[in-house]
């Protein structure tokens, strides 16, 4: 406990005569002799050792003073212990203090010495100070409990927004696809600045008369301009157009009204430290990494700079899907780096790797109940996606990840689509479709839905209980399609429980309407796991 206390100070008198001094000594002496049960003062040596002058010596008064101080110390310790155990918030903390002070009552106790000065003499009149009550003493000591928890560095000078570099401007979106710009600009006069993909040019994109308009920012002689005056930086150019309401060009008559700010998912490339390569995807390589801010382990998907703009847009589709979701069985998006090339998608790093490799290496050592639990995780994640009208379209063991605690997470949303009616019609041909995992209506008519994902989940179940075997291993893609049309289905894996295989067969109903929902699949797997204790 801290807080400065003051020694008692005798009342001052205006008279300075020797008679007045004699009167004070006499009064003090008489007062001392009138105190009940007070013995005569000890020798000067004795009471000096006690820290008192002869005029203040009173054994009972001294004992009472020490008793009060001991009570204060015990009360302080009790309050510290109690409040450290009970206080849950500042409001509750203040309420408890008020309660404790109210218990002290309104009557003020005699003055008390400061704790740090218990052994100092109080007879020196030139150092005597005004007394404080015991209540004030306690308050001062308790003030130490509320000392600031953290010390802050001195404030730094604030940099005006217009003087910050381009990459720190909230309206600079980096190398986002042109198609995404159209989704971001909502009202006439909305604008943003981006990097033109493949051309290393900066573009001002504005919505005007319902159409997105794109203006290349000219750079020459260390100045940036659109039409008219040049400016040393692009932020100064944009600030001038906003403040002056000058048209971007005389011919267009377009005026900037509102900046469209990048969302919280956008990271700078410098925010991410890349580690080793851990895989390769359709669009580029995958690296392990860490966030500079807090050392969070991450997986970083990179997009090859040589890809055409339409494929770069498809690469970012996964991030646009994932940033809407939050579920323990869905891999978590951390952010995207679009400020420059190459574009990154930053996701949580799931240390156990992909489910297919896990099944082939560790599957033989798993208990049946553990395997069912992992498929229960997959069903829970897919039930969540179903509730969000998200169609995965590429559900397979290779696209699921396993944590160090054997929790399964749905991943790889590169082919995913989110549709209001839960149905997606594909017109892109068969080039990238995983035929052996895809429902017949999707193969025949390009019709994708949660029901087609349920078919794929049945194949995932088969992969899990066959410990990573290839479905239809002896058939080509075309032969597989023909066999399915003729009613042929995969045989049950060795040692697969009968109730699990019956669930697979329900997932493989030819008519999508007869397949169970993911909610029903999830509940079935919970019941199956309980039966396999």
Curated annotation (Swiss-Prot):
Q: What Pfam family is a match, any one?
A: PK_Tyr_Ser-Thr
Its UniProt entry gives the catalysed reaction(s) as:
L-tyrosyl-[protein] + ATP = O-phospho-L-tyrosyl-[protein] + ADP + H(+)
EC number, UniProt record: 2.7.10.2
- Gene3D superfamilies cross-referenced by the UniProt entry: Arfaptin homology (AH) domain/BAR domain, Phosphorylase Kinase, domain 1, SH2 domain, Transferase(Phosphotransferase) domain 1
In what residue span(s) does the SH2 domain sit?
171-260
This protein's record includes keyword Transferase:
yes
Q: Name one GO molecular function term.
A: ATP binding
Where is there biased composition of kind Polar residues?
11-29
SUPFAM superfamilies associated with the record: BAR/IMD domain-like (SSF103657), Protein kinase-like (PK-like) (SSF56112), SH2 domain (SSF55550)
Active site feature: 394 (proton acceptor)
User: Which residues does the annotated region (Disordered) include?
Assistant: 1-46
The yes or no answer to whether the keyword Transferase is present is: yes
Q: Where does ATP bind?
A: 278-286, 301
Keywords of this entry: ATP-binding, Kinase, Nucleotide-binding, Oncogene, Phosphoprotein, SH2 domain, Transferase, Tyrosine-protein kinase
Give the Phosphotyrosine positions (modified residues): 424
- Residues forming the F-BAR domain are 50-124
Alphabetical list of InterPro entries matching this protein: AH/BAR_dom_sf, F_BAR, FCH_dom, Fes/Fps/Fer_SH2, Kinase-like_dom_sf, Non-receptor_tyrosine_kinases, Prot_kinase_dom, Protein_kinase_ATP_BS
Boundaries of every Protein kinase domain copy: 272-525
Q: Give the family, as the similarity comment puts it.
A: Belongs to the protein kinase superfamily. Tyr protein kinase family. Fes/fps subfamily.
Additional information: This protein is synthesized as a Gag-Fps polyprotein.
Free-text note on domains in this protein's UniProt record: The F-BAR domain is truncated and contains only the FCH region (the coiled-coil region is missing).
Q: What is this protein called?
A: Tyrosine-protein kinase transforming protein Fps
Gene name of this polypeptide: V-FPS
């Amino acid at each position: 406990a801290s807080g400065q206390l003051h020694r008692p100070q005798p009342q001052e008198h205006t008279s300075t005569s020797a008679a007045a001094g004699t009167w004070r000594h006499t009064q003090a002496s008489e007062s001392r002799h009138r105190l009940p049960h007070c013995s005569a003062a000890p020798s000067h040596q004795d009471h000096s050792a006690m820290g008192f002058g002869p005029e203040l010596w009173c054994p009972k008064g001294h004992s009472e003073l020490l008793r009060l101080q001991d009570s204060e110390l015990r009360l302080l310790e009790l309050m510290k212990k109690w409040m450290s155990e009970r206080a849950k918030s500042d409001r509750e903390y203040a309420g408890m203090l008020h309660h404790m002070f109210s218990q002290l009552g309104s009557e003020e106790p005699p003055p008390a010495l400061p704790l740090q000065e218990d052994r100092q003499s109080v007879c020196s009149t030139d150092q005597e100070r005004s007394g404080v009550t015991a209540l004030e003493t306690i308050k001062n000591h308790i003030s130490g409990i509320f000392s600031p928890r953290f010390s802050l560095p001195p404030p730094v000078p604030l940099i005006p927004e217009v003087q910050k570099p381009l990459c720190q401007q909230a309206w600079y979106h980096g190398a986002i696809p042109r198609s995404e710009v159209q989704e971001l600009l909502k009202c006439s006069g909305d604008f943003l600045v981006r990097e033109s993909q493949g051309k290393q040019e900066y573009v001002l994109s504005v919505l005007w008369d319902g159409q997105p308009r794109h203006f290349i920012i000219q750079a020459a002689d260390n100045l940036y301009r659109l039409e008219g005056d040049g400016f040393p930086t692009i932020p100064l150019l944009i600030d001038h157009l906003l403040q002056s309401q000058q048209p971007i060009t005389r011919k267009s008559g377009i005026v900037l009204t509102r900046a469209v700010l990048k969302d919280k998912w956008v990271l700078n490339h410098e925010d991410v430290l890349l580690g080793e390569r851990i895989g390769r995807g359709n669009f580029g390589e995958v690296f392990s990494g860490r966030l500079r801010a807090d050392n969070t382990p991450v997986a970083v998907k990179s997009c090859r700079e040589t890809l055409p703009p339409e494929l770069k847009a498809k690469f970012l589709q996964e991030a646009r899907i994932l940033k809407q979701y939050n579920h323990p069985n869905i891999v978590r998006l951390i952010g995207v780096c679009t400020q420059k090339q190459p574009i990154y998608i930053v996701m949580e790093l799931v240390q156990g790797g992909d489910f297919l490799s896990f099944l082939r290496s560790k599957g033989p050592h798993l208990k049946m109940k553990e395997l069912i639990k992992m498929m229960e995780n997959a069903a829970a994640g897919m039930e969540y996606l179903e509730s969000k009208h998200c169609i995965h379209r590429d559900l397979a063991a290779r696209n699921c990840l396993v944590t160090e605690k054997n929790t399964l997470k749905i991943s790889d949303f590169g082919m995913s689509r989110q549709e209001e009616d839960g149905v997606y019609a594909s017109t892109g041909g068969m080039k990238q479709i995983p035929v052996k995992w895809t429902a017949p209506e999707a193969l025949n008519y390009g019709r994708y839905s949660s029901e087609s994902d349920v078919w794929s989940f049945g194949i995932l179940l088969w992969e899990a209980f066959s410990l990573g075997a290839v479905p239809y291993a002896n058939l080509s893609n075309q032969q597989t399609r023909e066999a399915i049309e003729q009613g042929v289905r995969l045989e049950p894996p060795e040692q697969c429980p009968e109730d699990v295989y019956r669930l697979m067969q329900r997932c493989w109903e030819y008519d999508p309407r007869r397949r169970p929902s993911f909610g029903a699949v999830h509940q079935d797997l919970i019941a199956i796991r309980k039966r396999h204790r």
